[in-house]
C-alpha cells in the first residue's frame, strides 16, 4: 500500500507545483538533504567488470543492461544475421537515416528498450571457430549471462561445467522459464505463460471478468532485476574466494517471490486467495481508480485520517460519521455502496479539477495517465528519466534512463543500443588480438558479422 501512496503523490503534481518542479529540473546537481553534492566524475562501481551477454528478448537483457548502467562492459553476442529476437519485433521501429541498406526496417522500439550501454558482436556458435571465440571471450570476462533452455548449451561446450574449467573465477548466470531443476525445467517459459502458471494472471483483472496479463512483462523484468542482484552478490563473494559460481534464476521462482503479501495470505490462512480486484484493494476501502467527468483518477483513503480528508475534499464530511463507514472494516463490508458514492461525486468534475482540489491535502491521489502522458510527465522529466541520445544510424532517439539516483555516482546512457555487429571488429581485434585477415575469413564463413 505504501508504494501506491508514494507513486500517487509523485504523479499528482498540479499546476501550482509545476513552477517548483521546473526550477528543480534546472538544478540537476542540487545538493541532497544531508548528503554532499554528487561528484559525478567518480568511477562507476562496475567499471572494470566485463560481461559476456548471451541473452535475448527481455529478462536476460534487463539484467545485463542494469550491469551496463552501473559501469560494466557488456559484450552482447547476437546471431550474425537475425540478431536478438526483438530486433524484428516491430513496429514501431526507429527508422534508419544514414542511407545504408539493412535487412531490418529500423531499430525496433522493443530492442531499444533494454540494450543501451552494450557492445554487439554478430557471432554464430554453430561451428568450432565460433565456439572457440566464445571460449576466448569467457576467459576474458568476469560474468556470463545466458537464457537458453537448460542443457541446450552443453553440445556447444558453453555449459557452466565446461566454462568454469576455462575460467574458474567467472560468474555464470542462467536465466530460464522454470529453472535448472524440477518437473517443468525443460519447458520453454515466456512471461505470459509464467504469469498464468504462477498465479499472477489469476489475480489480475476486473472482479467479474476473465483474468488478464499485466500490461508490461513484469515477470521478465523482475527476473532480470533479481538476476542482476545475484550477479552482484556472486561478484562480492568472489572477492573472498576468488571463485565464480553458477546462478540459477527462473521466471517461475521470481514470479512466486513477487506474489508477496498475496502468497503470504494464502500460506497463513490455508485458504484460496480472494481473486481479482481490478484497481481496488481486497482489504482497504476506498483505495482504487474511479471515473471522473472526463477520465479517471486514483485515490487512497487508506486509513481513517485519509478517509476523512477524502470525504471533506469531496464535500461530504457527513460520510465520516456514517455508521456504515466509521472504520476500514466497515468500509470494506459496505464496499459497493461506498465506492458508488465516491465515484458519483468524482464524476461531477474533471480529473484536473480534482487534482487541484486534492493538492496539498496529504491524501494519496493520482491521475490515471497513458504512456505518452507518463513519458512527458513533468515529474518524470524533472527526474531526468527520459534522455535523448545520438544513435549511429538513426539520429536522435529518446530512451528511458536508469531509475536509481546516487549521491556520488551517475549511471547514465553512455552509449545507445548498438547496431547488429557494430563492435565485432573492435572486440575481436582489441580484446582477442585477431588480425584483419582472420576476421575477413570468419566473415566469409558467416561465423561473424
List the predicted regions and their residue ranges.
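Glycine-rich beta-alpha junction loops
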Residues: 81, 178-179, 251-256, 294, ...
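N-terminal helix-loop segment corresponding to the beta1-alpha1 unit
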Residues: 2-230, 234-240, 419, 426-449
Amino acid at each position: 500500500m505504501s508504494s501506491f501512496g508514494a507513486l500517487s503523490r509523485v504523479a499528482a503534481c498540479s499546476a501550482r507545483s509545476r513552477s517548483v518542479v521546473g526550477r528543480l529540473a534546472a538544478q540537476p546537481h542540487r545538493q541532497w538533504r544531508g548528503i554532499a553534492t554528487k561528484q559525478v566524475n567518480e568511477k562507476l562501481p562496475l567499471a572494470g567488470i566485463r560481461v559476456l551477454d548471451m541473452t535475448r528478448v527481455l529478462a536476460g537483457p534487463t539484467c545485463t543492461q542494469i550491469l551496463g548502467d552501473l559501469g560494466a562492459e557488456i559484450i552482447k553476442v547476437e546471431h550474425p544475421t537475425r540478431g536478438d529476437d526483438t530486433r524484428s519485433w516491430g513496429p514501431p521501429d526507429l527508422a534508419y537515416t544514414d542511407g545504408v541498406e539493412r535487412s531490418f526496417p529500423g531499430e525496433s522500439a522493443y530492442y531499444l528498450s533494454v540494450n543501451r550501454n552494450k557492445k554487439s558482436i554478430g557471432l554464430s556458435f554453430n561451428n568450432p571457430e565460433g565456439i572457440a571465440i566464445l571460449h576466448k571471450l569467457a576467459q576474458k570476462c568476469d560474468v556470463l549471462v545466458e537464457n537458453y533452455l537448460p542443457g541446450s548449451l552443453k553440445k556447444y561446450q558453453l555449459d557452466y561445467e565446461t566454462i568454469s574449467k576455462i575460467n574458474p573465477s567467472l560468474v555464470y548466470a542462467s536465466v530460464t522459464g522454470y529453472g535448472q531443476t524440477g518437473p517443468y525445467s525443460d519447458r520453454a517459459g515466456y512471461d505470459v505463460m509464467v504469469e498464468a502458471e504462477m498465479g499472477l494472471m489469476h489475480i489480475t483483472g476486473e472482479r467479474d471478468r476473465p483474468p488478464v496479463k499485466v500490461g508490461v512483462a513484469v515477470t521478465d523484468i523482475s527476473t532480470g532485476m533479481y538476476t542482476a542482484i545475484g550477479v552482484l552478490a556472486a561478484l562480492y563473494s568472489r572477492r573472498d574466494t576468488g571463485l565464480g559460481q553458477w546462478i540459477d534464476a527462473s521466471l517461475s521462482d521470481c514470479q512466486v517471490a513477487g506474489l508477496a503479501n498475496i502468497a503470504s495470505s494464502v500460506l497463513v490462512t490455508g485458504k484460496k486467495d480472494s481473486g481479482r480486484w481490478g484497481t481496488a484493494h481486497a482489504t482497504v476501502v476506498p483505495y482504487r481508480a474511479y471515473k471522473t467527468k472526463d477520465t479517471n483518477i486514483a485515490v487512497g483513503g487508506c486509513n481513517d485520517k485519509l478517509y476523512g480528508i477524502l470525504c471533506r475534499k469531496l464535500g461530504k464530511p457527513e460520510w465520516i460519521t456514517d455508521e456504515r463507514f466509521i472504520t476500514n472494516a466497515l468500509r470494506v463490508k459496505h464496499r459497493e455502496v461506498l465506492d458508488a458514492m465516491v465515484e458519483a461525486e468524482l464524476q461531477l468534475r474533471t480529473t484536473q479539477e480534482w487534482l487541484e482540489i486534492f493538492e496539498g491535502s496529504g491524501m494519496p491521489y493520482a491521475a490515471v495517465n497513458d504512456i505518452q502522458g507518463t513519458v512527458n510527465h513533468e515529474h518524470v522529466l524533472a527526474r531526468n528519466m527520459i534522455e535523448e541520445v545520438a544513435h549511429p544510424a538513426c539520429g536522435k532517439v529518446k530512451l528511458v534512463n536508469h531509475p536509481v539516483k546516487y549521491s556520488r555516482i551517475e549511471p547514465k546512457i553512455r552509449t545507445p543500443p548498438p547496431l547488429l555487429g557494430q563492435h565485432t571488429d573492435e572486440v575481436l581485434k582489441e580484446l582477442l588480438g585477431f588480425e584483419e585477415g582472420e576476421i575477413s575469413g570468419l566473415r566469409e564463413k558467416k561465423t561473424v558479422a
